């Protein structure tokens, strides 16, 4: 009990000392040259509007113990930039909109104290620090609106219960916006699609009706089988030679041929059949009448093209 209580009492003093050290570090002027080697134990790069740290090299300052990167608009803290800072004890990155803190910083050493704004971006770093460090230290974070320091663990438990970072929160917000757009636009798109399908079906129906009307104008083709007297019961069986009759495919203009050969059959017993060819040419069609011995022999057939 004594250790944590003493640490809680000493932490404000340490923060005050850190602030005193920071104030004693003058801000470096001029252009930032990351290839330059620094031999100072305290480096103050605050307010330099760096926005981004080098991704492929470390700061050349092996003796630095306090590094102030506050108020720069930084969003990422890559491990590669701090890799060679073996003496670093205090890293100040307040007043930056961080959305990524490399969790490898927690493995750099339990003696490194990180001062940052309260943010869910600290979750991975804090988790690894708790796993690797068992000291009585209580990491703190700065509440920017009030300027007060809070327990980082409590803040993460309350504000980031599911481990949401800014990137995850942004992704969820974007997904919600997309679902909202789909919910609004979905019924409209479905209505337009159904209307388009109905218009297509209606057009096909009209086209089929027009085709049937135009097809009805084609000339029918006729076949006739003359009326013959019924043979008596004792009539000998018919010859095995099949009977054929010409069927003329063409316009019914040759009606007078019926008048010369035979009188037209009565309408009550007529049957009609049409033979439809793709070339619409008149040509004789032969059919075997032997299979029609069971039906009256005076039938005529008429078929309308297209039916």
Swiss-Prot record:
Glycans are attached at residues 44, 56, 95, 132, 151. It is found in: Membrane; Cytoplasm. Residues 1-20 form the signal peptide. Residues 205-249 are annotated as: Disordered. GO terms for cellular component: cytoplasm; membrane. The keyword Transmembrane helix applies. The modification Phosphotyrosine is found at residue 286. InterPro entries: Leu-rich_rpt (IPR001611), LRR_dom_sf (IPR032675), LRRC25 (IPR039243). This is Leucine-rich repeat-containing protein 25. It comes from Bos taurus (Bovine). The gene is LRRC25.
